Amino acid sequence: IHQDFANQFDAKIEFRKDEVTPDTLETWLTDFFKDGGKGISITLPLKEAALNYADEISDRARLASACNVIYAKDKKLFGDNTDGQGLITDLENNLKVTLKDKKILILGAGGAARGIIPSIIEKDPASLKIANRTESKALLLKQDLEGKIDLKGKSLIFEAGGLTDDFLLADSYDLVINS
């Protein structure tokens, strides 16, 4: 998908996949950028570990506690997380869905949810509910994000709970996202 995108814009890049493990990540990153690499995309299980190797990280990466992109600029490595922005762009441009004033349910409280929730909140939904099989994990995610995201001036109803009928069926939803 990345190579197809580059080809659409006549960008001269090589996009390949390399097998990297948590044990080899630091050496691989050092060698890649030392050899003139400009940037990389990162997937599981390395997103959280990769955060530690960026000289600077974006607010999105900080909120997600993970990065899926590291790029070189001015002799520094910058880490970012584009998961949330990618979802928003797809919803708005391809599906013509706006999130403002919508009631949204997110199923799951792992890394994918953590990566998309801040971008969803930026779009001013009416409510955002995180439901997870392990209720405590949903509650911890909500609590952590509330401590990092400025919710002042927002009328957002932000809830978290388990996958119970009482919690899930208490509301209707405009959008359900399985993360």
Annotate the PLM regions:
Residues N81-G84, L91, L95-P125, R133:
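Glycine-rich adenosine-cofactor-binding loop
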Residues I1-L95:
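Phosphate/diphosphate ligand-binding glycine-rich loop within oxidoreductases
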Residues K123-I149:
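NAD(P)-binding Rossmann-fold cofactor-contacting core
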Residues G153-Y173:
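Short acidic low-complexity segments
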Residues E14-R16, L105, L128-K129, E159:
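A structural signal for isolated positions on well-ordered beta-strands in alpha/beta enzyme cores
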Residues I42, I177-N178:
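Redox-cofactor binding/interface segments in oxidoreductases and associated redox assembly factors
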Residues A11, D35, K73, I149-A160:
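A short helix-to-beta-strand connector/capping loop
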